[in-house]
Amino acid sequence: MKIQQAKPPVTQDTSATCPLTSTVQDSSPVAGQLGRPIGFRGLAGGCPVSPQGYESPPLPLGPDSLTWRYFGDWRGMLQGPWAGSMQNMHPQLGAAVEDHSTFFRERWPRLLRSLYPIGGVVFDGDRAPVTGVQVRDYHITIKGVDGAGRRYHALNPDVFYWAHATFFVGTLHVAERFCGGLTEAQRRQLFDEHVQWYRMYGMSMRPVPATWEEFQDYWDHMCRNVLENNFAARAVLDLTELPKPPFAQRVPDWLWAAPRKLLARFFVWLTVGLYDPPVRELMGYRWLRRDEWLHRRFGDIVRLVFALVPFRFRKHPRARAGWDRATGRIPADAPLVQTPARNLPPPDERDNPTHYCPKV
């Protein structure tokens, strides 16, 4: 991805802001005024001001979009540590993960279940805005003060958009590195689609760059001036104690220990190859010309292998169901595919409103 030098400074507002469609009561001065619903207009702070929380009804993406082609592909798992670490490098987002997330207790289930609602914001068709609001509202109560005394709130528009920006750039990475590449026109189309995608959440559009060129400036500014080498980002990259994935539960612990060491080193290397140079420097990694050549050859191998996989089976179940509805394979009103029970939060967390926890 072409990166330009940042021009005007891009601020990271730390004011507490929540969308108007959220109605949970909150008594914290971090989230809002005492005794007011956090959806109260006085707390909107630039969020959309229509009663539904949207400036105009959002139009979901469909099968004619490039986002449907590249997002929800299992190859996206290869950039998972990149996306997680990039998100957590944002100081507010990293603090929220450190203080509130169950990621450190349940790495695999937390990752695998989150793919369902995240994918649904793209692939749920007419129901995508509802899914987007659900995803947004999981974050209502996630707030606090970090170790440096800085306030954070997960629904700060700058923070929420940063997470979405990593989804967009992650989609570019998947297409560029593992799917054969993109033209400049396709990058611009994906940029426009990521804006349409973001509207599904009913969040303020204030932080969203207006053009592809402005987004490149925004991304460069974030990488150079905002992101931090923090505990939450390093924890994503620490794969030395990675538990067995669900499909390998029958593998004895002693047998898993050996490949885990190799996989840990490989996935860190794969992740570093996707970082922008300022992020590599921030996190203390070197990247040689030989590394770049090997990284691209690995991407070529992935592309060739996936060419042998039928299209439907390249897709996550939520994405596959979206395609099946669009092509008439299943009814348009078929129930949305939910995460299996093995991915549910720990029993003591299942009543926590910050978790996606379907009845399965």
Residue ranges and their predicted role:
Residues 2-3, 8-10, 18-360:
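Mature, function-bearing regions of proteins
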